[in-house]
Amino acid sequence: MKKLFSIALLLSLGGYMASAQELYMPRNIKAAYAKGTRSMNGKPGPNYWQNHGKYNMDIKVDAETKVVSGKEEILYSNNSSDTLKNLAIRFVNNLHKPTSPRSSAVSEDFLSTGLNISSFSIDGETYKVDSKNWGTVGNVKLKKTLAPKSKITVKIEWDYPLSKESGREGQIDPNSFFVAYSYPRISVYDDYNGWDRIPHTDRAEFYNDFNDYEFTIKAPKNYVVYATGDFLNPDEVLQPEISARLKKSYNGNEVIHIATEQEMKDGKVTKQKDWNTWKFAVNHITDVTFALSNHYVWDGASVIVDKKTNRRSSAQAAYNPTTGKDFANSVKYNLNALDWFSNNWPGIPYPYVKTIAFQGFADMEYPMMVNDSQFGDPVFAQLVQDHEVAHTYFPFYMGINETRYAYMDEGWATTFEYLIGIAEHGKQAADDFYKKFRVDQYINDKSTEEDQPIISMSDQVSGAGYGNNSYGKASLSYLALKDMLGNELFKKALHTYMSNWNGKHPIPWDYFNSMNAGAGQNLNWFFQNWFFTNNYLDLAISRVTPAKGKSTVTVKNVGGFAIPFDVVVIYADGKADTIHQTPAVWKANQKEVNIMVNTIKKITSISLDNGIYVDATPKDNVWEGK
């Protein structure tokens, strides 16, 4: 029996393997599967590896000069089977250098001198590093090669100025700073591309290894520091009452004003030494970020995110009490988001100890932090914050290569944003928001760049094509698959994918193969339709063929995407029937499908309702009876 089961399992997996090979696969990806680092059954292969760094950092922020400086020690492990002759060093904030390539024009306030490295050594040996000529990625040629399964210790001393104009990071106001991508890091070396040397140009986002961090932030008195990771020394840097409130907020759902506007003004929040050193630590995470201000107020509470263990996560907010009116409800919004994402979609307990919403300008996600704008519209503010918190799962929990595959990241955050929006504001409001911000612009623009295949490398796609491939089109594919499989099976398949790859570095083919395995069926026809074509959203009723008691409605798929739709039949007596079609209707014939409708009563009209899959030419979606 066991042997027969094993043979059946092999035949089943063989079916997945054969079907997966039907999808286009670049040569370097084929090589990874051939080497056994990835597997056609959706799981990491028997030879899978990823490199790792242990970062110990001491960082200082000078609020007067706006200079960030630091010392770091990196214990870097080469877990690959390759001998490394170079280190690729990534420093995203060199984007501010005048000589760095960027995806769009910037103002003078955006520009800075970039990174200065004053000391660089490997295993105690000093290196001369010309960081002034680096872009967002620099190269260090190793004096001694780094053998497989061996380690080196890299020590760096560095500094750089915070840009006056804040985007994803920089100065929010003269005394509030969001300090992201703040340290030189060893870039990713992976099994399918080797060193990641793609420059950051301010459009396509990031790709980082899972590392361990211990770090300190030295800040002037009265500046509160908010950061990724466990806050290790609140009693050393906060006054007793403030520290007590923070700890209390960790254990209850009631929003606590940890530090008020008046307390910040009166110097009653931080210890009154000239400088305070804030300590943080976190393991197995892709990045750490921090922010600080001497006048933002501070709120906090917590919520149970894992009902099996009763583990709680903290939700905090830091904002300007005068201008940040949206943020007065930020903790309440995040308590709801952490609970909803943990128990609904994706239905995996929020994996971190906290999330902090900091008032800034970027509307951007970071591990355990978001940097959001003040909108003046509480509904919109909540949806944006929901989107950024959803990024906890994609890219951070899942280790996504956002630079190459933004749709594996933004597409899921957009999907979860929509699903939580239904719970918060009702389906009609969520549909309207989704169509307005995620679909309308794309489908009403007939230009070529809108119809590039989703599988296109994100750093190679620009303009509207980048945004729509990454957000709306990718999200529509995930929601279409959910409609086709149904909630239960879709969640099973999604959890298979997330279980296979959380904490690692999946690529699109790992997603395809994992979903095939989790759903227990060959979905490659669907993935081919959505990811590897120039399809778009456009259905049409090509004809209605009457017959006794039944009529045949022939629906033509002009645009090509396998989308769900409703056939709405209006009868002469004013009553209506709605016949839902899942994307499975397109499996046998992706060009045209026949739908049978009841014609016992006289029909006034038949129409197609595509819902959020907004039709490019809605005028041909209606048939009027004679």
Where are these regions (language model features)?
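Short, hydrophobic/aromatic-enriched beta-strand segments in well-ordered soluble domains
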Residues: 72-74, 91, 150-164, 213-221, ...
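Beta-strand-rich binding/interaction modules
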Residues: 226-227, 239, 544-609
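Hydrophobic helix-coil surface modules that form long, contiguous segments used
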Residues: 190, 205-386, 415
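Solvent-exposed beta-hairpin/edge-strand motifs
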Residues: 84-126, 180-183, 218-223, 570, ...
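Hydrophobic alpha-helical and helix-loop surface patches within well-folded domains
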Residues: 24-40, 52-53, 280, 315-554
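Glycine/proline-rich low-complexity spacer/linker segments in large multi-domain proteins
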Residues: 99-110, 159-213, 234, 612-626
